A protein has these predicted regions:
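Transmembrane catalytic cores of multi-pass membrane glycosyltransferases
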Residues: 35-48, 62-63, 70, 74-75, ...
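Short hydrophobic/aromatic helix or loop-helix immediately within or flanking a transmembrane segment
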Residues: 51-55, 68-91
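Transmembrane-helix motifs of polytopic, lipid-linked glycan transferases
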Residues: 97-118
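Short acidic/glycine- and proline-prone juxtamembrane loop motifs at membrane-interface regions
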Residues: 138-147
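Membrane-interface transmembrane helices that cradle and orient dolichyl/undecaprenyl
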Residues: 152-168
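Hydrophobic/aromatic-rich transmembrane helices and adjacent perimembrane loops
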Residues: 309-336
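Signature aromatic-anchored transmembrane alpha helix within multi-pass, membrane-resident enzymes
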Residues: 333-357
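Short periplasmic/luminal acceptor-recognition loop of GT-C membrane glycosyltransferases, typified by
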Residues: 362-365, 372-464
Length: 490
């Protein structure tokens, strides 16, 4: 049923009446399974996050010359969680606990937001949420953003169903989410503002109101491109469904992506037949997804803020995750047919099968990396160049960070020089590069070793299939990529 024209509020976040605490626990355990099914969680930036949590502990003990902790109001919540857990649980368990908590916050926030209209639609909700929870944003390890977005899902689920008293009471959730990352808060605040205004206008006036909101987004688009050198492409519109979260590191992921998208299209067609297009377009839930899709399409994918050495990147992929959950909230109003249930289930099973197999391969390489790093002198400076040729985004980009914990220093760790995180570096630190341009050159393999870097070791993929790990003590004037092209161990 559509909302009333004025002052209507949607039903509150609720689960199926038979969805007991036991079932809630079971679903939570299933959601957490990918956090414990391998020896390590494979997520690109996670290695950097846990390593810098270890650096933060060294800073607190005055054992990290040239490093210091910045006091900042955002992009720190996940890092604070890691830093708080690390002294008590060690690096391995800390990663599993912190990531597991983030997954539960995100997945249950998404479930409540998707299910607030039709709580009994579990055949649709669970496969969709599971896949989105472990999609691209999880795999690249943007956990401050991920955690912040999960908190914002809880906020929106409560906001959409509450009157002004409840809406005021839940405002602190936005402050907590801001501590994680500002982008989800701006996204959620925009949706909440639109909802609050739309509820107070007649239903026929809501679509023009959405048009005004799109024009505002267009203004933001041009402002970011001019003021902050935003990089934008028309291709961003392809990300509006959020199904692209299933497209990971190679072409095989196009199979679960296509299946999920097909199931969603079939359900959308069923919703159109059940509700009629005009009724759907006038629905607040559709308009929220429309605005989220417009943000995906219009907000530049890369934004350069002057206070940071590293641009805010993958903005389109980040926003598409929220758009995917809002589209799922719209589609959850129709019960999937048997064929759609099969396609949704197949999509999730194939996706997680691929994720498991890829994580297994990466962990085998990381096992070798641990052995090689352990053989290097204690407190050595180490550079990692672990590019897998067939992967457009290197999944082991920061793996040497994790391998160095407690033994060595990842000399090209990107967080301190980026100025986006709380661990910062001063010029001349013996622990990590202070210039982000040097770090970026290391990642591309173009860096030329300087006298001031020595002594420093390189660990890199070697062997005919690039599945082995080798080490080399670098010399002044050597180029990272040239050394890494040697396939045989020294």
């Amino acid at each position: 049923m559509l909302e009333n024209s004025r002052g209507a509020h949607e039903s509150g976040p609720r689960l199926h009446p038979r969805f007991s605490w036991g079932t809630t626990l079971l679903v939570s355990l299933v959601m957490l399974l990918p956090c414990v099914w391998q020896s390590r969680i494979q997520s690109i930036d996670l290695s950097s996050h846990i390593y810098n949590a270890w650096l933060a502990s060294l800073i607190a003990q005055n054992q990290a010359p040239g490093l210091w902790l910045a006091h900042q109001a955002n992009n720190v919540l996940f890092d604070l969680l890691l830093a708080g857990l690390l002294p008590y649980f060690g690096a391995a368990a800390t990663q599993q606990i912190a990531v597991g908590l983030a997954v539960l916050v995100f997945s249950w926030g998404a479930i409540l937001l998707i299910s607030h209209r039709r709580p009994q639609n579990w055949w649709f909700v669970l496969p969709s949420v599971a896949a989105l929870s472990y999609g691209f944003i999880f795999q690249v390890g943007f956990f401050n953003f991920y955690l912040g977005l999960g908190i914002c899902f809880w906020y929106l689920a409560l906001f959409f169903s509450g009157r002004w008293q409840k809406r005021l009471l839940i405002t602190p959730l936005l402050a907590l989410a801001w501590l994680a990352h500002p982008l989800p808060v701006l996204w959620a605040a925009g949706l909440a503002l639109y909802t609050a205004v739309a509820e107070r206008v007649p239903a026929p006036a809501r679509l023009p109101l959405a048009g005004v909101a799109v024009v505002v987004l267009l203004g933001v688009h041009f402002w970011l491109r001019v003021a902050y050198h935003g990089v934008w492409s028309i291709d961003q519109a392809w990300f509006a469904t959020g199904a692209n979260q299933l497209l990971l590191f190679d072409r095989k992921y196009s199979v679960p992506y296509a299946l999920l998208l097909a199931a969603w299209v079939m359900m959308l067609w069923g919703l159109v037949k059940e509700r009629r297009l005009r009724a759907i377009v006038g629905d607040l839930m559709f308009q929220r997804w429309l605005l989220a899709a417009a943000a995906v399409s219009m907000i530049p994918a890369i934004i350069t803020f002057p206070q940071y050495a590293l641009p805010l990147s993958f903005v389109t992929s980040r926003l598409s995750l929220g758009a995917g959950v809002l589209l799922a909230a719209l589609l959850a109003q129709v019960q999937p047919k048997r064929g759609e249930k099969v396609v949704l289930t197949l999509s999730a099973l194939i996706f997680f099968g691929f994720v498991f197999r890829d994580a297994q391969k990466l962990n085998r390489i990381e096992d070798q990396l641990d052995v090689v790093v352990a053989q290097l002198p204690r407190n050595s400076r180490v550079i990692g160049f672990l590019r897998i040729p067939s992967k457009p985004i290197p999944p082991l980009l920061h793996a040497v960070d994790r391998a160095c914990i407690g033994h060595c220093f990842s000399y090209a760790s990107y967080e301190p020089s980026s100025r986006q995180f709380r661990v910062r570096v001063a010029e001349g630190s013996p622990i990590v590069m202070a210039d982000y341009d040097d770090v970026a050159s290391v990642e591309t393999g173009e860096y030329v070793v300087k006298a001031g870097d020595l002594p420093v070791f390189l660990v890199y993929l070697c062997g005919p299939d690039r599945q082995q790990v080798c080490s080399h003590q670098l010399r002044e004037g050597e180029v990272i990529d040239s050394v890494a092209s040697v396939h045989e161990p020294e």
